[in-house]
Amino acid sequence: MIEADRLIQPNIIERDEIEAVDRAMRPKMLDEYTGQDDTRAQLKIFIQAAQKRGEALDHMLIYGPPGLGKTTLAMIVANEMGVNIKSTSGPVLEKAGDLAALLTNLEPNDVLFIDEIHRLSPVVEEILYPAMEDYQLDIMIGEGPAARSIKLDLPPFTLVGATTRAGALTSPLRARFGIPLRLEFYNVKDLSSIVTRSAKVMDLAIDDEGAIEIARRSRGTPRIANRLLRRVRDFAEVKHRGEVTKIIAEEALDMLDVDAEGFDYMDRKLLLAIIDKFMGGPVGLDNLAAAIGEERETIEDVLEPFLIQQGFIQRTPRGRIATPRAYSHFNIIQPVS
């Protein structure tokens, strides 16, 4: 299992991330949202069109690696539409009654946000189909031969589902989302803007180079950038006069064992396992998981995406392969095949 205090783990939310300062860091409207330009442009059109027609926005599926702002986007959609948002997650909705209670309390055009929607149970998913398509809720009354089905009308609403594993959704559920949106890793420029904005909310002095250095080591992920910013702030307040510069950011992040590529101990452990234990690969996912003592799902969902996107690992039909860039990162000469 990945350590709970892994600084760059994007799917762990720190306790202080739900406090007021973190809520203030989140953009409230699309104009405040940084990055994901294509997604933002599409959403503006869809929201304005729905508002002109006086209708609920079409159901929306937001997918991509953890920490890229899926929850934030759902809240922005509700704010832009001027409606309420009710939030839950797939594992929490164990029974059909859990979902029915949420649906029957929605006001017209409200947003229902379901995180980890790929983890919905089949019985809950079945209830969701008519609710999404016809705004109706099918409920069974009674048991056995006396059981009967009744239909309850629901107000028009927008379901926003979020997932890191879009492929794990069943085809019938995936087909019912009219607006699929994929979030990509952020570039350094956009991330540095997010770091600068967050520092302002925290009343922290930071120069452009300091923000860029934190952004460079944040794995393209805003959640990680904000987490690293907090730790750099601690370092700056204790070791220096509180202002974050490039040198201070470098010192702090080096001390935290986050290297220039944004890798920590687990990333390096995975790459070195492929290079040293499996001679650069290919290696199957199960063997790799056993070699580093990690679950295969964690490798697939948390560790691999950024390493693949940055060109350190290749995924082939025969398994994972370390690329020349991975060898170069550790100053290891790649053997000739």
UniProtKB/Swiss-Prot annotation:
Which family is this sequence assigned to?
A: Belongs to the RuvB family.
Tell me the segments the record calls region Small ATPAse domain (RuvB-S).
Answer: 187-257
From the broadest rank down, the organism's phylogenetic lineage runs:
Bacteria, Pseudomonadati, Pseudomonadota, Gammaproteobacteria, Alteromonadales
| Name of the molecule in the record | Holliday junction branch migration complex subunit RuvB
Start and end residues of each stretch annotated as Large ATPase domain (RuvB-L): 4-186
The UniProt entry's GO CC annotations, sorted and at most eight, read: cytoplasm; Holliday junction resolvase complex
Query: What does the subunit comment say?
Result: Homohexamer. Forms an RuvA(8)-RuvB(12)-Holliday junction (HJ) complex. HJ DNA is sandwiched between 2 RuvA tetramers; dsDNA enters through RuvA and exits via RuvB. An RuvB hexamer assembles on each DNA strand where it exits the tetramer. Each RuvB hexamer is contacted by two RuvA subunits (via domain III) on 2 adjacent RuvB subunits; this complex drives branch migration. In the full resolvosome a probable DNA-RuvA(4)-RuvB(12)-RuvC(2) complex forms which resolves the HJ.
Could you say which residues bind ATP here?
Answer: R26, G67, K70, T71, T72, E133, D134, Y135, R176, Y186, R223
**What Gene3D superfamilies is this protein classified in?**
1.10.8.60, P-loop containing nucleotide triphosphate hydrolases, Winged helix-like DNA-binding domain superfamily/Winged helix DNA-binding domain
**A GO term (biological process) for this protein?**
DNA repair
Q: Show the domain comment.
A: Has 3 domains, the large (RuvB-L) and small ATPase (RuvB-S) domains and the C-terminal head (RuvB-H) domain. The head domain binds DNA, while the ATPase domains jointly bind ATP, ADP or are empty depending on the state of the subunit in the translocation cycle. During a single DNA translocation step the structure of each domain remains the same, but their relative positions change.
Chain positions covered by the region annotation Head domain (RuvB-H): 260-337
- Name the predominant localization: cytoplasm
As for subcellular location, the record says: Cytoplasm
Q: Which domain of life is it from?
A: Bacteria
Q: Name one Pfam family in it.
A: RuvB_C
Q: What are the GO MF terms of this UniProt record? A: ATP binding; ATP hydrolysis activity; four-way junction DNA binding; four-way junction helicase activity
Q: Could you list this entry's UniProt keywords, alphabetically sorted.
A: ATP-binding, Cytoplasm, DNA damage, DNA recombination, DNA repair, DNA-binding, Hydrolase, Nucleotide-binding
Q: What class of enzyme is it?
A: hydrolase
Please list the residues that bind DNA.
Answer: R296, R315, R320
Binding of Mg(2+), residues: T71
Q: Which residues cross the membrane?
A: none
